[in-house]
């Protein structure tokens, strides 16, 4: 079986968790607990573009808070 996370023709969601980390998620798989949909189903490239334009700081939110104290 092919990896559903690498299907160039698939539709995906963009998820984010409370740490501000993003995930490209296949649209047909249930969203896991602790993750929120921030970009509805689109093609893989559109979702990757969204992630690239919105996730500019790769540090988890908890680490950003500690470093800014």
Swiss-Prot record:
Known Gene3D superfamilies for this protein? Structural Genomics, Unknown Function 30-nov-00 1gh9 Mol_id
Q: What Pfam family is a match, any one?
A: MbtH
Q: Name the InterPro entries on file.
A: MbtH-like_dom, MbtH-like_sf, MLP_fam
Which SMART domains does this chain map to? MbtH
- Quick one: a GO cellular component term? cytosol
Give the highest taxon in the source lineage.
Answer: Bacteria
Q: Which intervals of the chain form a coiled coil?
A: none
Give the GO biological process terms. Answer: siderophore biosynthetic process
Q: By its UniProt entry, which PANTHER family does this protein fall under? A: ENTEROBACTIN BIOSYNTHESIS PROTEIN YBDZ
Q: What is this protein called?
A: Uncharacterized protein YbdZ
């Amino acid at each position: 079986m092919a990896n559903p996370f690498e299907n160039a023709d698939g539709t995906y969601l963009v998820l984010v968790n409370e740490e501000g980390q993003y995930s490209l998620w296949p649209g047909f798989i249930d969203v896991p607990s602790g993750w929120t949909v921030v970009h509805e189903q689109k093609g893989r490239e559109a979702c990757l573009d969204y992630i690239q334009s919105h996730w500019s700081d790769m540090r988890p939110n908890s680490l950003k808070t500690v470093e800014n104290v």
